Amino acid sequence: MSEAGGRGCGSPVPQRARWRLVAATAAFCLVSATSVWTAGAEPMSREEKQKLGNQVLEMFDHAYGNYMEHAYPADELMPLTCRGRVRGQEPSRGDVDDALGKFSLTLIDSLDTLVVLNKTKEFEDAVRKVLRDVNLDNDVVVSVFETNIRVLGGLLGGHSLAIMLKEKGEYMQWYNDELLQMAKQLGYKLLPAFNTTSGLPYPRINLKFGIRKPEARTGTETDTCTACAGTLILEFAALSRFTGATIFEEYARKALDFLWEKRQRSSNLVGVTINIHTGDWVRKDSGVGAGIDSYYEYLLKAYVLLGDDSFLERFNTHYDAIMRYISQPPLLLDVHIHKPMLNARTWMDALLAFFPGLQVLKGDIRPAIETHEMLYQVIKKHNFLPEAFTTDFRVHWAQHPLRPEFAESTYFLYKATGDPYYLEVGKTLIENLNKYARVPCGFAAMKDVRTGSHEDRMDSFFLAEMFKYLYLLFADKEDIIFDIEDYIFTTEAHLLPLWLSTTNQSISKKNTTSEYTELDDSNFDWTCPNTQILFPNDPLYAQSIREPLKNVVDKSCPRGIIRVEESFRSGAKPPLRARDFMATNPEHLEILKKMGVSLIHLKDGRVQLVQHAIQAASSIDAEDGLRFMQEMIELSSQQQKEQQLPPRAVQIVSHPFFGRVVLTAGPAQFGLDLSKHKETRGFVASSKPSNGCSELTNPEAVMGKIALIQRGQCMFAEKARNIQNAGAIGGIVIDDNEGSSSDTAPLFQMAGDGKDTDDIKIPMLFLFSKEGSIILDAIREYEEVEVLLSDKAKDRDPEMENEEQPSSENDSQNQSGEQISSSSQEVDLVDQESSEENSLNSHPESLSLADMDNAASISPSEQTSNPTENHETTNLNGECTDLDNQLQEQSETEEDSNPNVSWGKKVQPIDSILADWNEDIEAFEMMEKDEL
């Protein structure tokens, strides 16, 4: 399911076009297997590689020979009973049988494999059999998706290599595009499926009667999967380029355009199934496995084959979302498209094994190595990759139909790195197939990988893909009779020539008005990767990535619980306590993840904590996670009577600022209430010690001034008491997390220490690192800096008053917490301090992480002149919050002389906002029914 290469110099390419093809596809060349390899595995000798390659040839002969002897012209071989599987003559297997159309499926699917394996005589015989025996006008209902990738793709792959062999002058001299004519006939038979208002095809079609006729027995379906509708462009475009009939590519493009338009705009993810008439998402979970996988694959490969930049832009947008939400290295977990920080399930399916290969094509090697290694560890535990397995690597669905996706990714990782480790992985696959799946009449699928029981099936993709990738893994360039890098692999591993990008380009590229997400794609200036850049002077690079994952499966197994105290004595860090947790601390988030606790930023600006014990790194971590959640509930109970406070302002009033710089500050739940008392004005001075956690050693420096204190090491209230005792008239706590900012993080408020704080009489405010650095820089530049602590900006000079109207008092809305679920426990959470007490304000079962909405700056003129504009704010992860967040009162956070700076994101059209809002409402309603 991934790209083979792309030097663009295939034999069928005219010389005048060759340079254009090279220029168009050079970025997608996979480096040769002579690349730098990691020292973790000994290089495999040419003799051993040749031996393994010959073993693959023998295995193919065993499978293909038994199909031809015992099953042909049936679609597939039943290897346990040594007979063919004919539609209607065997008990129905449901949707699986929709791939069977009484068109000798396995033979067509195997055509180009014969050429790759250098079985040219057998290929010529097979083509003659297809032309003589195969009938495409059968009264049978088939899957549009499966028929496209297996039959249409097989015919086109066979045609591509037939004309290559004919040009070489030895074989196929009689061939006159007969396979192409069959492909065109099949293409026209599939076109009626696109007769929908959306342009998305029906999932099934009758080869003889089409759609919606009484005798068709199909056409009443309303839903299709995203991959089913989005995995057509390669085959349909190739058919158009080969024949000049543009209608096929046009229909496939229209389907892709519709899917792109229907993506969830805030997450840029797509669901699993969609209504083909309305475009509504039916299943709103999203991942890279079954139901979606090849949609992403075909966006990138369509760019390679067709050279249309829009496909690459779409892929990059989706890929950014995948890596942001779905990728949890080394895992790839499905999420909800409207709540992408919330996992939709706790298991993964085997089809995602193709994704590391696609990442190689993208040029993102590190996560490809990580996920591939995780999958390999699962295989070593179960001999094969189960159809689905849980996040702790237990079997969820025990079947294994001899899927080739893992072999595919193994091949492309070897091509990209030249690491002999992947040859050893391939050797393991060969050994397992022969040891556990081989039967006298072929290779049988595994009914249960735990018991080794078989199922009487050998799917056509086993011959189309598995043996192709395994042979290419061990073959040297001279072992293949053509240059494999002149072709692109379809999702069924059929070969389409890259020179099609310069042929019959009459189809105009649709000028879509859709906006693409601006992405920092600097990490992928090359695609595929140059190992000399990726592994500079470090032959152990790939091994260093794999090493931590070597025992990932075994470590997930249940084991006796070690006493926590003993683990502390052995040098392990104590578990994260709820009172120390800070939502903006990456280290804390990593600890939560290890404990199986997910921090989810919801669209309404709230934060949700969810614990899944099975996702914890170990049983001890799961226990720590449960303790953490219980502590959160206790903190909520302790702080329930505390009030939520609006943001405050720190205004620099000394020369040369004169009130022009106003910084958004977080309030304290103790000390002088600036909304009820006069503002505090004074010069600032740094405290010693900088964290203010002990008696100050420089009381003379802070006497009568506003003390600057570093966050951390003790409670906020303790800091306040220490600077108050030193004579300070106020305090500003500056965040110790470098880079934190009020325009990218929610408002933070400082809580007390659970004791009586009436003794604290001075005002205390909190500044994030970015805002705090402005004051520190001003001190370095001007030495004496005077600030005003207030509930809102005041005393601006006349020039500033002319530029900007006085800001209205900020209200703090929607600062109630979010539910946190741990087993049957639910609590509401608010922003908490690292190493200080949490701000907890709500009912007894609620806990606030103070105002999870950002303090954005919108000038009064903007608020009045554009009442319908959506000024999006940003949560901790940079994720856009939803429309209801925008209704929150926004505080001014100016840091320059322009008073009208808005920290909001770019404006969306109101129709788009309302459409996404309606989708979110539907998703929230549906979420109540989800099993999480």
From Swiss-Prot:
Residues 674-779 form the PA domain. Glycans are attached at residues 118, 195, 504, 511, 810, 814, 900. The active site is at 146 (proton donor), 293, 387 (proton donor), 405. It catalyses: N(4)-(alpha-D-Man-(1->2)-alpha-D-Man-(1->2)-alpha-D-Man-(1->3)-[alpha-D-Man-(1->2)-alpha-D-Man-(1->3)-[alpha-D-Man-(1->2)-alpha-D-Man-(1->6)]-alpha-D-Man-(1->6)]-beta-D-Man-(1->4)-beta-D-GlcNAc-(1->4)-beta-D-GlcNAc)-L-asparaginyl-[protein] (N-glucan mannose isomer 9A1,2,3B1,2,3) + 4 H2O = N(4)-(alpha-D-Man-(1->3)-[alpha-D-Man-(1->3)-[alpha-D-Man-(1->6)]-alpha-D-Man-(1->6)]-beta-D-Man-(1->4)-beta-D-GlcNAc-(1->4)-beta-D-GlcNAc)-L-asparaginyl-[protein] (N-glucan mannose isomer 5A1,2) + 4 beta-D-mannose; N(4)-(alpha-D-Man-(1->2)-alpha-D-Man-(1->2)-alpha-D-Man-(1->3)-[alpha-D-Man-(1->3)-[alpha-D-Man-(1->2)-alpha-D-Man-(1->6)]-alpha-D-Man-(1->6)]-beta-D-Man-(1->4)-beta-D-GlcNAc-(1->4)-beta-D-GlcNAc)-L-asparaginyl-[protein] (N-glucan mannose isomer 8A1,2,3B1,3) + 3 H2O = N(4)-(alpha-D-Man-(1->3)-[alpha-D-Man-(1->3)-[alpha-D-Man-(1->6)]-alpha-D-Man-(1->6)]-beta-D-Man-(1->4)-beta-D-GlcNAc-(1->4)-beta-D-GlcNAc)-L-asparaginyl-[protein] (N-glucan mannose isomer 5A1,2) + 3 beta-D-mannose. It is an enzyme of class 3 (hydrolase). Residues 790-799 have a biased composition (Basic and acidic residues). InterPro entries: 6hp_glycosidase-like_sf, EDEM1/2/3, EDEM3_PA, Glyco_hydro_47, PA_dom_sf, PA_domain, Seven-hairpin_glycosidases. It comes from the Eukaryota. The keyword Glycoprotein applies. GO terms for cellular component: endoplasmic reticulum; endoplasmic reticulum lumen; endoplasmic reticulum quality control compartment; membrane. A motif (Prevents secretion from ER) lies at residues 929-932. Residues 812-825 have a biased composition (Low complexity). Residues 790-908 are annotated as: Disordered. One of its GO terms (molecular function) is mannosyl-oligosaccharide 1,2-alpha-mannosidase activity. Residues 856-890 have a biased composition (Polar residues). Its cofactor is Ca(2+). Pathway: Protein modification; protein glycosylation. One of its GO terms (biological process) is protein glycosylation. It is found in: Endoplasmic reticulum lumen. Ca(2+) binds at residue 491. Involved in endoplasmic reticulum-associated degradation (ERAD). Accelerates the glycoprotein ERAD by proteasomes, by catalyzing mannose trimming from Man8GlcNAc2 to Man7GlcNAc2 in the N-glycans. May also participate in mannose trimming from all glycoproteins and not just misfolded ones targeted to ERAD. May have alpha 1,2-mannosidase activity. It is linked to Congenital disorder of glycosylation 2V: A form of congenital disorder of glycosylation, a genetically heterogeneous group of multisystem disorders caused by a defect in glycoprotein biosynthesis and characterized by under-glycosylated serum glycoproteins. Congenital disorders of glycosylation result in a wide variety of clinical features, such as defects in the nervous system development, psychomotor retardation, dysmorphic features, hypotonia, coagulation disorders, and immunodeficiency. Contains a protease-associated domain (PA) of unknown function. Belongs to the glycosyl hydrolase 47 family. This is ER degradation-enhancing alpha-mannosidase-like protein 3. It comes from Homo sapiens (Human).
